[in-house]
């Protein structure tokens, strides 16, 4: 009865809860954004998970137009996520959790080289660094924890303490869990502002949120904002679900923004997109969401198509649980991808991040004569993928990781493969010359290839696949949006 009464109140007063409009900065799977203001420059990075080589760092001068500048290409420490990118003095720091601990890498130049990872041996996830006006460094982690660091920020310097309990949202709200995480710290006008996430990263559409607290000391007491939640999805009817994991940043002209991630309800398998919306500082020293402010448009994302004829692999490519820079080569003959394993479950994968609800990917493939196969997939994880791979004799058309249909390969060892993602329904086509196409499968449902079904907080990605003992060749990879803009 109480839950029904609360839902009635929400329905009656929904205009009071209507969220601000937002700017879509990066469509596709760009979760857990961390934004650094460095003079007139802005840098942003996101979770890397099992996609190697490592964290991709972007650069902007206006928060709207972003270009990739480097990968943090270091030793793999396990699935790495929720980073915090900072600059102290003339050194860049990237803190991140992986393998049950927290790590840091450093660089004098944002483009690298970056150091080897240092294990801080600090518990918790989602690290957030703060440097006090006196120069002391502290690392916050999930659950309201804080750990003092050494003066160089490369080791702990004391015990971890719990200093913040979070903001108590109404019990009737439909969330995944309390899950106090994503602490991001800002020093502003005599206060430390702690921006956190609560409610769970996925699960119900209304789960995630951004909340704020402030204190005169990193050890508290922390006072929760009267404007909480700063960002939240109040209804499953909203376009953006599970909005959370926010970082606040001062943009050009003194306008402040909160940058966060969210799922597109119409393309959940696409992952968590990066968005931002304006905030303002109040006369009583809090920041809050801004309503009815005209918003700028973000620039287009860099293209994903690749002819593989350059001197090095494009920025858009990653390996799955292994660093592609160690084995993928490009040149006048295209991409050479050494085979591994016997199927997409254990084979070699090279992936890119889709940006659209509907898109077409196409590639030209040359398969070795024997003991090898190659293909084009939409890949979430080993438990969830669809697409086609083939050797010189047969096609295997995957509806999912456990079910495939085998049919004769009448195209031979050289062919073109096309995947058409039509709002989470997949069509698979092949061609011998790139002009006349044969449809192998239609309307394979891929809408359930996402975290709420398979876990891991990943996204469905186009993937080149090479299996067996020899190298397969790929040319003319094309990615085309099917969305009318």
Stretches with model-predicted labels:
Residues 1-22:
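Bacterial Sec-dependent N-terminal signal peptides
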Residues 20-485:
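Carbohydrate-active catalytic/glycan-binding domains of CAZyme proteins
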